[in-house]
């Protein structure tokens, strides 16, 4: 383990952390479109929902925890209402979804058409992270992670393919763990590798429909999912040692890539996984 004392980046809140800044790119073509975002009650999903709404995108924001989703949507909409007149403002509609249930995704697509008369983008963000060694993981844990992380992406993409307008984009959340394994994360790593390959297959099959499919592969991002790392000095040091930029990423930095992939700037980009990991896959 390195003994290097990593300096704080400008604007950072602590060693290895950086204050998230909103992406500067506006992408005006997104205004007036409609997106579904799963796993949107907290973490990166909540940042995605608000970041899209700030660019005039109407969002069906879904989570298995409906109460938390309603609270997040209410807060985002209140901040939207406080923006100056003339500012692009989307609305966030909260919804409940169990991503392991195909019918739940169909309901989200129906809601998008009912509330906003169409569907343009789909973000398969919901996921779970069970920490368990291969020798100890239970069949129930394996089943749960595959249902949420893999089947959830598949079922969401199927619904998107059936209901999205031509020219639409699907973005799936993979992970640096798809290519860089860690102890105690076997099932999670396998699920995220599956997402990366599923994304490629979807891109090939849905190209005829005029739909693009890409994935984002985050590394250590400052969210609730990495709180255990941040609260353990030894774990944090190990994490920072494995990142060439020597800090955690912010959800806003992942949002910037998401906005690009949904925008016209990426209209010839499909079947790819974009890493947002500070270079950690190369260490």
Regions found by a protein language model. Give the residues of each.
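Short C-terminal tail/terminal secondary-structure segment
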Residues: 2-26, 180, 259, 270-283
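Residue(s) in the substrate-gating loop at a strand-loop-helix junction
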Residues: 175
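Substrate-binding pocket helix/loop in short-chain dehydrogenase/reductase
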Residues: 133-134, 141-143, 239
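Active-site loop-to-helix junction immediately N-terminal to the catalytic Tyr of the SDR YXXXK motif
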Residues: 137, 181-189, 201, 226
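Active-site helix of classical SDR
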Residues: 157, 191, 199
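Alpha-helical segment proximal to the catalytic Tyr-Lys
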Residues: 162, 204-208, 267
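C-terminal substrate-recognition "lid" of short-chain dehydrogenase/reductases
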Residues: 116, 154, 163, 247-276, ...
